[in-house]
């Protein structure tokens, strides 16, 4: 290893690691230290195989970094290793997926015979020096093409032997050496970019780019690409590879002051039901909850597995360059990079290989909810000089997007015998986009003819956002959806009939839930809007809220709510529950996850009870024994398979109050003592932390609700009259909500106005 020059030995070292191989390398200060480390790493790797098709990188283990591995890219980073002797440098290999791209080396040339440009196919005209010729590949080009930097680039394999010529710079921006050459705009050569072909009349001899035969005729002899100038026969258009090269500003120019563009750019709103970044319990509080003394150990209040309220993803489904135009303006042919993501089609102006799209250059966003239909075009071209488009996207705004170009029409239809060059090509972008958009507009269901009519009826009314999962229940999954005619966001519960048992208990529960929702009408209960049934699925459409009570609890710094917010939410729950009980309905699965909130950004939102999958019609003085609900919120009589009535909901209310004020569950199921014994042990049920900060009246209400004896359990009427749920501040909070909602009073009464004074 060459260490000539001024060096200073630190007496330290680093460890190069490649797989299971480790080697200690002395750390010295030298201008070429990074190159020396890379060379030694290359020698280690070459002992296991060749590096011809792979790139090598060094990463330092940085445990304080979120990524754990920190790339080593500059010599200045080497000096910091002296502060951390013995650090490990990981050798990472990455396969090369790119072809070596090098520029032509051209010089002016005089031709004695007719010669055509190898780029555009037109005849090189003139007496002397008609064009330029590459010394390496002997290809000929127009002089004007030479000035288009990044276009005259070839993929040469194998590489020429005369590297001296290749090392000479051809253009100002392409001066890198052979394998390091990568002009930014030449990256587009590696992207499948379609040509924008239009009929053209040629005044000079021109050959076809595909077959090298002359374009014959007096007028409109062939097709010319609007962007790169390539010329082809009509019959050869289908065989032209999608390798168009765009010059500067070749993609449609966009005026971002246009209201249409502003609307598209401003639609990147945060989707509903997305968890905020701070919905986590801080580590110090979580640690305090988990490390309590064993005698008062509680379960930390968190969402059970499989009950996450929001599963919003930003999954990219399909992308690629597409040619399109609006039916009302067929002359304006546009070329954009289409990407399906977030339940919308994004049309980007810029795309670079390895970098991706430029998010600041969005031409338009087409939400799936605005698409009414996707229709294949089998007719003639809108304009005779352009090929027919492949399919149409029709929207609720009466805008029709014509997508793709059908080159088969120029040759009189698809060829009977597919050329060998075409047989290995994948399905065209237009075909994939047509099928994908058509499938995306359908609700999640089986693809069979029996379901087609019912699924089409539902798809015409609602667009299900299948990548925005709101939650899951015992029989189905809840998705976000858009009502097409109004744009209103709703929640759709997709129920799979396959989950129903053969005995029919599942179907009975589902029908009971729908029947209950159809009979209820209360501001505190989620509203049923629509129901549709296919052979294997049932779609239940309900109004959508912006979160649930559990999310609100977990979003707090201490993982619990204060008394004022708890009382505000509790009165709304009790009023809705009283309405259900008056209708003879027991919810049977009351818990924070099933209490939806109108606004996660407010401390005093409206609440609505949802998920009536376990709800039962229980008349007065009758009991049931069927299994219902979530065990953590159920009273002993249900867990012990004894008879229960509507008072089981009051037990659930007591558990909700407990977990809301403390952040933990009231009972430890792992203890050998029974629930009744745990209730009698006040020090176990209400430890000093955090119950010393809670009013004694709240503890009194919880104790009266968590009674093992059904008869001793507080009724809903007495609960609403309890002293903890009275007070001027609570009255004003509830009355303010009623005024904001502009609904008839359902939380307060005129007697409260007399007692506390009217709201000012």
Curated annotation (Swiss-Prot):
Listed PROSITE patterns: PROTEIN_KINASE_ATP, PROTEIN_KINASE_DOM, PROTEIN_KINASE_ST, ZF_DAG_PE_1, ZF_DAG_PE_2
One Gene Ontology cellular component annotation held by this UniProt entry: cytosol
Residue sites binding ATP per the record: 470-478, 493
UniProt keyword Signal, yes or no: no
PH domain mapped to chain residues: 316-444
Domain Protein kinase, first and last residues per copy: 464-725
Enzyme Commission number(s): 2.7.11.13
Activity regulation, free text: Activated by DAG and phorbol esters. Phorbol-ester/DAG-type domain 1 binds phorbol ester with high affinity and mediates accumulation at the cell periphery. Phorbol-ester/DAG-type domain 2 binds phorbol ester with low affinity but may mediate initial contact, resulting in a conformational change allowing previously occluded domain 1 to anchor the kinase. Phosphorylation on Thr-626 is then also required for activation and may also result in a further conformational change.
GO BP term, example: intracellular signal transduction
Cited Pfam families: C1_1, Pkinase
Keywords: ATP-binding, Cytoplasm, Kinase, Magnesium, Membrane, Metal-binding, Nucleotide-binding, Phosphoprotein, Repeat, Serine/threonine-protein kinase, Transferase, Ubl conjugation, Zinc, Zinc-finger
Active-site residue numbers: 589
Domain comment quoted from the record: The PH domain inhibits PKD catalytic activity in the absence of DAG, either by direct steric occlusion or distortion of the PKD catalytic cleft.
Family per record: Belongs to the protein kinase superfamily. CAMK Ser/Thr protein kinase family. PKD subfamily.
Known role: Converts transient diacylglycerol (DAG) signals into prolonged physiological effects, independently of PKC. Role in the regulation of growth and neuromuscular control of movement. Involved in immune response to S.aureus bacterium by activating transcription factor hlh-30 downstream of phospholipase plc-1.
Protein name in UniProt: Serine/threonine-protein kinase dkf-1
Organism of derivation: Caenorhabditis briggsae
Protein's gene: dkf-1
């Amino acid at each position: 290893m060459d260490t000539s020059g001024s060096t200073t030995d630190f007496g330290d070292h680093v460890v190069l690691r490649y797989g299971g191989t480790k080697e200690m390398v002395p750390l010295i200060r030298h201008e070429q230290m990074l190159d020396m480390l890379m060379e030694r790493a290359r020698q280690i790797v070459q002992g296991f195989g060749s590096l011809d098709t792979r790139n090598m990188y060094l990463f330092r283990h940085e445990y304080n970094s979120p990524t754990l591995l920190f790339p080593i890219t500059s010599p200045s980073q080497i000096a910091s290793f002296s502060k951390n002797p013995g650090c490990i440098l990981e050798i990472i290999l990455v396969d090369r997926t790119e072809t070596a791209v090098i520029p032509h080396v051209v010089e002016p040339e005089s031709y004695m015979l007719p010669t055509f440009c190898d780029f555009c196919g037109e005849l090189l005209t003139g007496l002397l020096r008609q064009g330029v010729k590459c010394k390496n590949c002997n290809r000929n080009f127009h002089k004007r093409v030479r000035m288009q930097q990044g276009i005259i680039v070839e993929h040469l394999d194998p590489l020429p032997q005369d590297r001296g010529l290749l090392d000479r710079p051809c253009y100002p921006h392409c001066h890198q050496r052979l394998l390091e050459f990568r002009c930014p705009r030449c990256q587009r050569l590696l992207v499948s970019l379609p040509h924008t072909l239009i009929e053209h009349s040629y005044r000079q001899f021109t050959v076809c780019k595909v077959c090298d035969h002359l374009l014959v005729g007096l007028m409109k002899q062939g097709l010319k690409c609007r962007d790169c100038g390539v010329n082809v026969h009509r019959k050869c258009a289908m065989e032209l590879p999608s390798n168009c090269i765009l010059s500067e500003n070749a993609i449609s120019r966009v005026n971002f002051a246009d209201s249409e563009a502003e609307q598209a750019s401003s639609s990147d709103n945060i989707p509903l039901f997305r968890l905020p970044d701070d919905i986590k319990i801080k580590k110090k509080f979580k640690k305090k909850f988990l490390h309590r003394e064993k005698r008062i150990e509680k379960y930390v209040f968190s969402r059970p597995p499989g009950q996450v309220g929001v599963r919003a993803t930003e999954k990219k489904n399909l992308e690629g360059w597409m040619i399109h135009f609006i039916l009302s303006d067929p002359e304006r042919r546009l070329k954009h990079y289409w990407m399906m993501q977030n339940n919308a089609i994004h049309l980007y102006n810029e795309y670079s290989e390895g970098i991706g799209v430029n998010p600041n250059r969005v031409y338009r966003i087409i939400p799936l909810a605005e698409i009414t239909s996707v229709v294949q075009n089998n007719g003639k071209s809108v304009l005779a000089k352009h090929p027919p488009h492949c399919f149409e996207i029709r929207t609720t705004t009466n805008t029709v997007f014509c997508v793709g170009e059908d080159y088969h029409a120029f040759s009189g239809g698809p060829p009977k015998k597919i050329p060998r060059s075409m047989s290995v090509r994948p399905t065209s972008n237009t075909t994939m986009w047509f099928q994908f958009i058509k499938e995306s507009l359908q609700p999640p269901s089986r693809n069979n003819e029996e379901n087609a009519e019912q699924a089409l009826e539902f798809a015409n009314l609602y667009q299900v956002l299948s990548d925005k999962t709101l939650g899951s229940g015992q029989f189905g999954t809840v998705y976000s959806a858009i009502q097409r005619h109004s744009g209103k966001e709703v929640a759709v519960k997709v129920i799979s009939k396959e989950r129903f048992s053969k005995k029919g208990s599942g179907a009975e529960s589902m029908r009971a839930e729908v029947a209950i929702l159809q009979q209820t009408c209360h501001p505190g209960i989620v509203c049923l809007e629509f129901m549709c049934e296919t052979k294997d699925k049932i779609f239940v459409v309900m109004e959508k809220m912006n979160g649930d009570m559990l999310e609100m609890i977990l979003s707090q710094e201490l993982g619990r709510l204060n008394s004022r917010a708890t009382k505000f939410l509790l009165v709304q729950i009790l009023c809705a529950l009283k309405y259900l009980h008056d209708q003879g309905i027991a919810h049977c699965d009351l818990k924070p996850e099933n209490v939806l909130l109108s606004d996660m950004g407010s401390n005093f939102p409206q609440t609505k009870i949802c998920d009536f999958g376990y709800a039962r019609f229980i008349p007065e003085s009758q009991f049931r024994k069927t299994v219902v609900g979530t065990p953590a919120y159920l009273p002993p009589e249900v867990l012990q398979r004894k008879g229960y009535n509507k008072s089981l909901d009051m037990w659930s209310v007591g558990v909700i109050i407990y977990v809301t004020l403390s952040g933990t569950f009231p009972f430890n199921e792992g203890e050998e003592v029974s629930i009744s014994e745990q209730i009698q042990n006040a020090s176990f049920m209400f430890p000093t932390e955090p119950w010393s900060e809670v009013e004694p009246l709240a503890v009194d209400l919880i104790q009266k609700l968590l009674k093992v004896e059904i008869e001793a359990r507080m009724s809903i009427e007495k609960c609403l009259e309890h002293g903890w749920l009275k007070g001027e501040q609570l009255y004003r909070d509830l009355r303010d909500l009623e005024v904001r909602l502009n609904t008839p009073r359902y939380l307060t009464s005129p007697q409260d106005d007399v007692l506390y004074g009217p709201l000012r």
